[in-house]
Amino acid sequence: VIVCKHAPISQIQIKSAIKFWQNLGYRFENVKYKSDPTGACATEKPWGYIVIHLVDKETNLEPTALAQTHFFVDNLTGKINWATIKMRPDVRDTVLEHELGHALGFLHFNRIEHLMNQKWEMGGWDTLGLRASQR
């Protein structure tokens, strides 16, 4: 995971979000905060990384969306090769964890209080089905 230079994420926020997913059984290597030694932040396809950016004017973000994640799945292996997360400046609780969920391959699950609920107002911290051991 690389938090790019202008991403509206604090070091505490990324550490907390990573810990959240680690507690569900996921591993993250080489987490970088506003340091990009590989140049992953400058490419559209950051192979092997999840990169987090501030949303920009080129991003076609719906007016009600709080963030947007794109990920690339290799059709042969079924594995995610890279993901980009674009965040609005006003990051709300659960949004970073939700977007990391997309980067891990989870889609929306519209259950009340669930982390992956499409509507932030209806979501929460429920992690039903998100444990690495349940995949």
Name each region found by the language model.
Residues 11-103, 107-110:
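Metzincin-family zinc-dependent endopeptidase catalytic domain
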Residues 106-130:
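Post-HEXXH active-site segment of zinc metalloproteases
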Residues 134-135:
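C-terminal cap/linker of serine protease catalytic domains
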Residues 1-15:
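Fold-level signature of zinc-dependent metallopeptidase catalytic domains
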